[in-house]
Swiss-Prot record:
The modification Asymmetric dimethylarginine is found at R52, R53. Residues 48-101 are annotated as: Disordered. Interacts with host CCNT1. Associates with the P-TEFb complex composed at least of Tat, P-TEFb (CDK9 and CCNT1), TAR RNA, RNA Pol II. Recruits the HATs CREBBP, TAF1/TFIID, EP300, PCAF and GCN5L2. Interacts with host KAT5/Tip60; this interaction targets the latter to degradation. Interacts with the host deacetylase SIRT1. Interacts with host capping enzyme RNGTT; this interaction stimulates RNGTT. Binds to host KDR, and to the host integrins ITGAV/ITGB3 and ITGA5/ITGB1. Interacts with host KPNB1/importin beta-1 without previous binding to KPNA1/importin alpha-1. Interacts with EIF2AK2. It comes from the Viruses. The gene is tat. A motif (Cell attachment site) lies at residues 78-80. GO terms for biological process: DNA-templated transcription; positive regulation of transcription elongation by RNA polymerase II; positive regulation of viral transcription; symbiont-mediated perturbation of host chromatin organization; symbiont-mediated suppression of host innate immune response; symbiont-mediated suppression of host translation initiation; symbiont-mediated suppression of host type I interferon-mediated signaling pathway. Zn(2+) 1 binds at C22, H33, C34, C37. This is Protein Tat. The cell attachment site mediates the interaction with ITGAV/ITGB3 and ITGA5/ITGB1 integrins, leading to vascular cell migration and invasion. This interaction also provides endothelial cells with the adhesion signal they require to grow in response to mitogens.
Amino acid sequence: MEPVDPNLEPWKHPGSQPRTACTNCYCKKCCFHCQVCFITKGLGISYGRKKRRQRQRAPDSSQNHQDSLSKQPSSQPRGDPTGPKESKKEVERETETDPLD
C-alpha cells in the first residue's frame, strides 16, 4: 500500500474515486468502472425505492368474460353415477348362475 497523506480526507485519497463519472451504459467496461457500478450494473443490486406500477383499469370486455364464465354449466362428476352399482349387480348374477364345484 502506498502511504497516504494524513491531511487528506478519506474520500479524496487517490484511487478512492474513478477519474471518469459513472454512466448509464451497461457494457462490460462500464459495469467494472467502480464498485458502485459493479454492484448496481453487474450484479443488479439496488437498494433504492422501487417504483410502484400503476394498476391498469380492466376494460369493459373483461366484465363480459366474467359473465360468460358464470353462465357456463357447472362441472358434473364424470361417469355414470349408476354405473358402478350395475356392475356389482351383474357380478352377483354371474356368481348365482355359475355354481362353484
